[in-house]
Amino acid sequence: MNILVINGHLDKESYCQAIFQTIVENIDSKRHELEMINLNEEEFDPVLRYGYRQRMEDDPFILRSQELIQWADHFIFVYPIWWSSIPSLLKGWIDRVFTPGIACSTNNRGSFILNYLRGRQFKKLLKGKTASIYATSMAPTWWYKVFSGPINIPDSYGI
């Protein structure tokens, strides 16, 4: 199995970094292929400047991330929960990497968003892939159950 481990914490001395390192060190290399993305070591623009209506300039890190997303069978996300959500750096990476054509596609012409709103079907290009999430928080679990609902990666990508 091809496994991609993504660390979404900005601090290189964080508990998430320790979890990330432990996961990487303990994956059985005889049974699995492993790749890693440690967002706190990368320099990239996490801002999706034009939504998906206009293509942004190619960024080598984003292109490599998209290759790894297509390569992986299983994703492991490690990140803290801040303000009941994922860190902005991880959110920006998801916005820039899980784009139409990588995460999903439509056979219809025109705007991806308008086609979606009109109920037109789109193909899930990552179907069959799995993920694990290691999310840390300083708040008790009941806080998220009461105020935020289930903790998950934003599901607006149709993955």
Where does each model-flagged region fall?
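Short beta-strand "acidic-cap" motif of Rossmann-like dinucleotide-binding folds
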Residues: 36
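N-terminal beta1-alpha1 ligand-phosphate binding loop
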Residues: 1-32
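Flexible, glycine-rich phosphate/dinucleotide-binding loops
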Residues: 12, 43, 140
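Short, solvent-exposed amphipathic alpha-helices that sit
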Residues: 18-29, 147-159
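A generic structural signal for short
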Residues: 11-12, 53-54, 144
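Helix-loop-strand module that forms the ligand-binding subsite of alpha/beta enzymes
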Residues: 57-154
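N-terminal beta-loop-helix "entrance" segment that forms/cooperates
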Residues: 39-57
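Cofactor-binding loop segments of dinucleotide-utilizing enzymes, especially the Rossmann-like FAD-
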Residues: 8, 39, 136
